């Protein structure tokens, strides 16, 4: 069982600074005083990205969490990311600005149901996408991210059956790219499943010179229309090295902030959700705000706590991922 608790203190909290400038200044002061590091995912609001020490995808942020010298990690993302930081750095205080910042994909894979599913396939190695709870990670043999899923699967023995969880769209894409047959848990991301194919086709007609870039959590019919598929960090990298000056982006639009900063002369368009709704934004990622970031540094809560037995079991497949990735990188040099 995983506990996510708010650790109470008797500390008196000052009023919230009244201007954005004062708020950012107060956050910077607290960060220095507490020897804290602020990690932010690409899907966070731009003003949080701008104040973060490091911005990245799940793999990059996992590495930062494992190697930081800070005493306090503030994870501006969702709770499975903060859990991962705590798993890798149990001696650190790990704060999440809003404890309600969950994940529909992680919620789609309850630990008890996953255990029953895994027990039906005892000969399979369990590869779990990092977008899952600590309790599911603890039942896994190897953790992957969308950045490294294909290459990690390719490193596994060819005769080894593989169970992949929890994202079925990513699983299908990994299966196609690797040529490996995967037994796939039927989970999905509420954001990446809501992009409108009709809206995408209209954008392609209006901007025939634009390249469509997509995250592999998208539905297969949308991936078939993409010119390039990759994780958030790889999508960002592609926009920098491509000679194309216009992109249609199929992932959570928070990434557009970094794309525009790194490519000020290029144009980026996000794809609306079905029926033109704004559901292409992750409601959980958007729960974190500068005010909540300041508050968690001021009060040192909410903090992430994980039962040590679960943490130790979850650490093994994450560390295995990091070791496999490092081994491959070393062999390429």
From Swiss-Prot:
UniProt keyword terms in alphabetical order: 4Fe-4S, Cytoplasm, Iron, Iron-sulfur, Metal-binding, Pyridine nucleotide biosynthesis, Transferase
Function: Catalyzes the condensation of iminoaspartate with dihydroxyacetone phosphate to form quinolinate.
Enzyme class: transferase
UniProt subcellular location: Cytoplasm
Family: Belongs to the quinolinate synthase family. Type 2 subfamily.
GO biological-process terms attached to the record: 'de novo' NAD biosynthetic process from L-aspartate
GO molecular function annotations of the record: 4 iron, 4 sulfur cluster binding; metal ion binding; quinolinate synthetase A activity
EC number(s) given by UniProt: 2.5.1.72
Pfam families: NadA (PF02445)
Cofactor(s) in the UniProt record: [4Fe-4S] cluster
Protein name, UniProt field: Quinolinate synthase
Reactions that this protein is recorded to catalyse: iminosuccinate + dihydroxyacetone phosphate = quinolinate + phosphate + 2 H2O + H(+)
One GO cellular component, as annotated: cytosol
Entry annotated with the keyword 4Fe-4S: yes
Residues binding [4Fe-4S] cluster: 103, 189, 282
Chief place where the protein resides: cytoplasm
Cofactor: binding comment: Binds 1 [4Fe-4S] cluster per subunit.
Metabolic or biological pathway: Cofactor biosynthesis; NAD(+) biosynthesis; quinolinate from iminoaspartate: step 1/1
Positions that bind iminosuccinate: 41, 58, 129-131, 146, 215-217, 232
Top-level lineage group: Bacteria
